[in-house]
Amino acid sequence: MDALLQLKGIDKAFPGVKALSGAALNVYPGRVMALVGENGAGKSTMMKVLTGIYTRDAGSLLWLGKETTFNGPKSSQEAGIGIIHQELNLIPQLTIAENIFLGREFVNRFGKIDWKKMYAEADQLLAKLNLRFKSDKLVGELSIGDQQMVEIAKVLSFESKVIIMDEPTDALTDTETDSLFRVIRELKSQGRGIVYISHRMKEIFEICDDVTVFRDGQFIAEREVATLTEDSLIEMMVGRKLEDQYPHLDNAPGEIRLKVDNLCGPGVNDVSFVLRKGEILGISGLMGAGRTELMKVLYGAMPRTSGYVTLDGHEVVTRSPQDGLANGIVYISEDRKRDGLVLGMSVKENMSLTALDYFSRAGGSLKHKDEQQAVGDFIRLFNVKTPSMEQAIGLLSGGNQQKVAIARGLMTRPKVLILDEPTRGVDVGAKKEIYQLINQFKADGLSIILVSSEMPEVLGMSDRIIVMHEGHLSGEFTREQATQEVLMAAAVGKLNRVNQE
């Protein structure tokens, strides 16, 4: 079968790093090609070379059988290559239709925008995705998951021959994911080629026909998905066997460190639980169940309307994140790029940002040597892959960005560490490193709350698990009691089992 798109022998270097070396990718008509690899393997760089954002140093790009070079995203888009980025690229103040057709609005014979036609065309695109809202709605009023579906509708509006999807389900619900897969199958039947970039093994084996593996900027293999298992694919990605993906540390927790009684706030109703020293408490539940809201009320980022929180036996009132930090409660956001990191600043500046008090003299000036020493220690401890601590953090892979975000929280020497979706968008190799770090914190007596949508992660890492449903606590389970079936029953409200100490 002739490829619609073929990249061969692609090299790309940046100062101090060879991002791609002999990389290759084929996209076939009517098939979905998964592109997988650890963060930093070169997947994003390859997409930027393909769409013309980066100029390749060596290699060839064949588009519909002809040697081609794209000058930028616009030329690749006009040629028939569409890309759905992991980061949303929408304007909240405009309607869905205005976002979809921005810069190419329909005009009537008088040169004015034909709003009726534009909304009708946009509504048809939304209907293809089985979405229930209309295109005259403002994008800013949509959930993150619905905004991602608008991004997909926008790319479909170009009638692209090849569509690149970069972690497209990262913010989608199961229903939205099912709708996306239905659309992908429809696109396949029309002879379009899909590049599907994802860390989610289940999705790759469900929707993809072929898979291309990158490792350290190099092409490792192209295989039919049907010939592989999850384990064999992961081993190709990381170059080693993965034993025990969730390395649980079986230490007995200590005395109660945090006690939450009848806590209420936006999206949180009458929640009570305890957390012990050296314990990992998993928080499970469906999207919108109130898990993140509970953590933000606890940390001080959202207002508490009633209830009590005690830390080491003393009542704590957190009216702001600063109060949370001052009391030893650190929250690592689920959205590290929006809430957790300053992408234009360096690794060092991001890591030490909340701990500057520890590196400040009485007059307010910084002890730069102390700061550099501490940052260097964390970079080594966390195995952060960066050319230097002065590197802009936005240039690091997702897994390394997440390590920096966690290190920043630990620099303030907290008593309670809240990790909200700590491995979202992180590859399997970096996940294992993060799990090992979490176990190290646990062994040191740190109390950890692990919020995750990945049930195997919650089940594998937690000592106890509580489940949220519609702002309430719907279940509490020991490690031995917890199964995927039990957690799901509690998450949908079919089971209510809460045993408080």
From Swiss-Prot:
ATP binds at G37, E38, N39, G40, A41, G42, K43, S44. Keywords: ATP-binding, Cell inner membrane, Cell membrane, Membrane, Nucleotide-binding, Repeat, Sugar transport, Translocase, Transport. It is found in: Cell inner membrane. It comes from the Bacteria. CDD domains: ABC_Carb_Monos_I, ABC_Carb_Monos_II. It is a peripheral membrane protein. It holds the Pfam family ABC_tran. InterPro entries: AAA+_ATPase, ABC_carbohydrate_import_ATPase, ABC_transporter-like_ATP-bd, ABC_transporter-like_CS, P-loop_NTPase. It catalyses: D-ribose(out) + ATP + H2O = D-ribose(in) + ADP + phosphate + H(+). PROSITE patterns: ABC_TRANSPORTER_1, ABC_TRANSPORTER_2, RBSA. One of its GO terms (cellular component) is plasma membrane. GO terms for molecular function: ABC-type D-ribose transporter activity; ATP binding; ATP hydrolysis activity. SMART domains: AAA (SM00382). Residues 5-241, 252-495 form the ABC transporter domain. Its EC number is 7.5.2.7. Belongs to the ABC transporter superfamily. Ribose importer (TC 3.A.1.2.1) family. The complex is composed of an ATP-binding protein (RbsA), two transmembrane proteins (RbsC) and a solute-binding protein (RbsB). Part of the ABC transporter complex RbsABC involved in ribose import. Responsible for energy coupling to the transport system. This is Ribose import ATP-binding protein RbsA. It comes from Salmonella choleraesuis (strain SC-B67). The lineage of its organism: Bacteria, Pseudomonadati, Pseudomonadota, Gammaproteobacteria, Enterobacterales.
